[in-house]
Amino acid sequence: MQRDRRYRYRLAPYNKYQLPPCEEQSKATLSTSENSLWPECNSLTLHNVSEVRGIPSCVGFTVLQEWPIPWDMILTDYEMFILKKYMSVCMCCATINVEVTQLLHGHERWLIHCHCQRPGSLQCMSAGMLLGRWFKMAVYGALINKRCFWYREVVNHLMPKEVMYVGSTFVRGRHLIYFKIMYDGHAWLALEKVSFGWSAFNYGILNNMLVLCCDYCKDLSEIRMRCCARRTRLLMLKVVQVIAENTVRPLKHSRHERYRQQLLKGLIMHHRAILFGDYNQRENPWAADGH
């Protein structure tokens, strides 16, 4: 496993080397071995190949302990050719374990894994270094969470705990928007009845994550970011409506989300470390009281 020690805080790469408009936009589906673009994450073949240091702006993904990356949304055609031909990478190849230390300071190290048949080979090591560099683009892009922290406040206003926006990253003119659907049944309903446009769904070990890709706000102007937030919120409200129509238990707004935003803002803006237990306190996925 290789570690890249060089790291730079830069906002400039946001608008450098923007990708052209995508002609074939994928749709979020419940992936199976037949229709999935990425191989299934199998713990029997999993082995770590690289390590990337995070920044405080990534803490929204750190608390989830996994970060799915739809590679087809941020890589060029040639890079996708290399990834498919010489690598065996699942969609959620970046994981982290924060339950041991319980302290989140924003500079945790993400472990990148692959599922190739020859772990430790020269090809595997080279792929690990390249994967680390590609993943670092997403880490750099997470600085948009610091620049537009209001995005989470707007999108998650009075939303239930079952559907929550968790963070964004901005890579090569593509804005990847992540939100978490707590229950498997709710995720199935959302994917079955709501059209999300260019999107991807990851059925992870710990979370159900839906990733939306927006290229309308590629210039990062205030008005376009506001329009993007409004569109994201409308899609989330559609998901909430679909879930409410097909379930018995009522959906109530999360009373813990504002406290979480205060913790995240203190870490992202002022580098105040937080405890993982404080972020997840009173979190009960089976409670109907909106926590």
UniProtKB/Swiss-Prot annotation:
<keyword id="KW-0244">Early protein</keyword>
<dbReference type="GO" id="GO:0030430">
    <property type="term" value="C:host cell cytoplasm"/>
</dbReference>
<keyword id="KW-1035">Host cytoplasm</keyword>
<protein>
    <recommendedName>
        <fullName>Early E4 34 kDa protein</fullName>
    </recommendedName>
</protein>
<comment type="similarity">
    <text>Belongs to the adenoviridae E4 30 to 34 kDa protein family.</text>
</comment>
<dbReference type="Pfam" id="PF04528">
    <property type="entry name" value="Adeno_E4_34"/>
</dbReference>
<keyword id="KW-1048">Host nucleus</keyword>
<comment type="function">
    <text>Plays a major role to prevent cellular inhibition of viral genome replication by nuclear bodies. Assembles an SCF-like E3 ubiquitin ligase complex based on the cellular proteins ELOB, ELOC, CUL5 and RBX1, in cooperation with viral E1B-55K. This viral RING-type ligase ubiquitinates cellular substrates prior to proteasomal degradation: p53/TP53, LIG4, MRE11-RAD50-NBS1 (MRN) complex, ITGA3, DAXX and BLM.</text>
</comment>
<comment type="subunit">
    <text>Interacts with E1B-55k.</text>
</comment>
<dbReference type="GO" id="GO:0042025">
    <property type="term" value="C:host cell nucleus"/>
</dbReference>
<dbReference type="InterPro" id="IPR007615">
    <property type="entry name" value="Adenovirus_E4_30/34"/>
</dbReference>
